[in-house]
């Protein structure tokens, strides 16, 4: 019976993936009607815990794999020993040999039980990944849902105008947000709690208010874009945020726990947009450029100037890089563009705020790192790029940059 059930689940996983790759309509229906069930049940369950459940599930998974490898090595060793003793055992028939053989037999029975458990665990991982991640890659895009088809005919003038708007917003908001005596950005929660400096015990005052505000902003965005409506779990800080920094990762959506997780070691102005970005994945928008765009909208439409500033900062680099790329790859088109509209200058304060991790944190992280940050970053880049391409995102990590096209499309229509 268990074998039949195992292969039935395997068949279901294959069928779901075949359907997903061949029918966007099926994926859209699944995200609209089935996917929210997992968020509202399992997501609420894992949301009870104040820590990232997904993080510890990954640790447990690594331990299970390590145990499987260790048991495999031991089984191989015992197998060779048994092979070498086979003839002597039958010739001698000694008690000691029989006892050793009996003990080996018990170990192999335990090993079989463990591998049976490991097989079912691996099957569960494949099923959860299919239901909570892989199907999402083949659904209709956010822009197709709400903006219509993109004709792709955007001019360099439109790009620079959009860049100027974002740069000028950043310049303005950089002067409006509250700052400490040292000039560091300060988040002020609705109850007046200030969060600024991260010490050995974390952020002073905690980031719970910011996480709740991110969820509220996403729910408000759902009034205009129905697929974003509904309940959101509170984003959670990751215990292994130092390791996240070494990967240059700001956050993770864990399909195994239905959680939005963020790196709480990075600069505080990265955190609001990251929270909203990861929450966007919990509404079925798995593409990174779409999550970037949704996060941007949620932040800039906030009444909190800190969230607004964080939202504009989150896309500034993408726009700046595209303008720079225009200048480097097509100087003639760039000259024609600047004859119409000059790119705006970015203030020194914005450049100071526009960082991933502070120098002090980098010194601390690299000072205690077991593996060099460059090695971890390179490995993470390969993993993320490969994962995206396997799931049908042909340009891999470069797809993050497509948020610029979504911004151009949005502002043209609005």
Feature map (PLM): residue ranges:
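Alpha-helical transmembrane segments
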Residues: 2-9, 53-60, 73, 111-122
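Active-site recognition of the HExxH zinc-binding catalytic motif
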Residues: 50, 273-292, 296
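Post-HExxH zinc-binding segment in Zn-dependent metallohydrolases
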Residues: 286-333
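Contiguous, non-catalytic segments that form substrate-binding/exosite surfaces or channel walls
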Residues: 91, 95-100, 104-258
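Pan-zinc metallopeptidase signature
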Residues: 349-414
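Membrane-embedded alpha-helical segments of integral membrane proteins
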Residues: 12-82
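Short pre-active-site segment immediately N-terminal to the catalytic Zn-binding motif
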Residues: 254-275, 282-286
